[in-house]
Regions:
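ATP/adenylate-binding site constellation spanning eukaryotic-like Ser/Thr protein kinases
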Residues: 66
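Basic, Lys/Arg-enriched alpha-helical interface segments
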Residues: 1-58
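Enriched for short, Lys/Arg-rich terminal
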Residues: 31, 69, 73-94
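Short acidic-hydrophobic surface loop/beta-edge motif
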Residues: 59-63
Length: 94
């Protein structure tokens, strides 16, 4: 059985804000951000344990092409819960 990605409300809000920001910056950049996230979500789903545990059983995956990190946990029943998608250039991060 394959892993299933589930977005928390906070992660969905983080993504919405980032897409709006990137679309204001340049037409189509928000879509590129979403496409990049899809690729990284697939990588996480394929091998979730490849990302290191950084704090409180939360794993972090760094995105190469955008200044963001994906924070997630591995739950029972093959669920991967995306907790946050943080912009590493903004403070505070939480």
């Amino acid at each position: 059985m394959s892993n299933v990605i589930v977005l928390s409300e906070d992660a969905a809000e983080d993504i919405d804000k980032a897409v709006k920001y990137y679309d204001e910056l340049s037409a189509g950049l928000g879509i590129e951000f979403i496409s990049t996230l899809d690729i990284y979500f697939s990588k996480i789903a394929a091998v979730p344990t490849a990302s290191a545990i950084r704090y409180d059983n939360v794993r972090v995956k760094f995105i190469d092409s955008f200044p963001f990190t994906i924070h997630f946990t591995i739950a029972p029943d093959n669920l991967i819960i995306i907790l946050r998608v943080f912009n590493t250039h903004q403070q505070p991060f939480w």
